[in-house]
Amino acid sequence: MAFYLPDWSCCGLWLFGRPRNRYSQLPEEPETFECPDRWRAEIDLGLPPGVQVGDLLRNEQTMGSLRQVYLLAVQANSITDHLKRFDAVRVPESCRGVVEAQVAKLEAVRSVIWNTMISLAVSGIEMDENGLKALLDKQAGDSLALMEMEKVATALKMDETGAWAQEISAVVSSVTAPSASAPFINSAFEPEVPTPVLAPPPVVRQPEHSGPTELALT
């Protein structure tokens, strides 16, 4: 517990001692802020292998460029994480073509992000906000598509009865081939038509009493 000795001033007695820590207003210019450690770690992690510009960004870049590089680094790390987790999933043969195309697209987007980050770090300029937003939105859409395919592939992997999923291509090809899907029919074979069974005709009997003749059906 801290103890304070009272102190006298021209205005009276300071009961808790004379204040020693004065308030200083934070600088309004974001360029004077220190680079957050989280940003630096994210940028270092999101750069291409063998490239480290975290120290360069920390010392020379403005806060605007640093923010853009940080956002790009987050997106690049997200792509890398998706690709690593997706490679560990067993993809059915019928879906492999679509999955490989999507993975190649994500890798291309990540390469564009890497080149943009290096350009911002070296030149010290800021990227147009509309262009940055378009790049981030493009990556976000591709990541959502990849996540949906990842969930489907994961479900197929966990379902032991999903062997039918691996035979989708074979089923589709068999449907398009009539010889493989339709049964063999011999045109020379004439099936025997069964003879219908008819009820016996009604018996007409003559009544025994006299009078007008009446016919009764039994």
From Swiss-Prot:
Whether Hydrolase counts among this entry's keywords is: no
Q: Where is this region: Disordered?
A: 199-218
Q: Where in the cell is it found?
A: Host cytoplasm; Virion; Host Golgi apparatus
* Protein origin, superkingdom: Viruses
> Record's InterPro entries?
Herpes_U44
Any Gene Ontology CC annotation: host cell Golgi apparatus
User: Pfam families of this UniProt entry?
Assistant: Herpes_U44
Q: Which family does it belong to?
A: Belongs to the herpesviridae UL51 family.
Q: What is this protein called?
A: Tegument protein UL51 homolog
Record the organism.
Epstein-Barr virus (strain B95-8)
**Highest classification ranks of the organism:** Viruses, Duplodnaviria, Heunggongvirae, Peploviricota, Herviviricetes
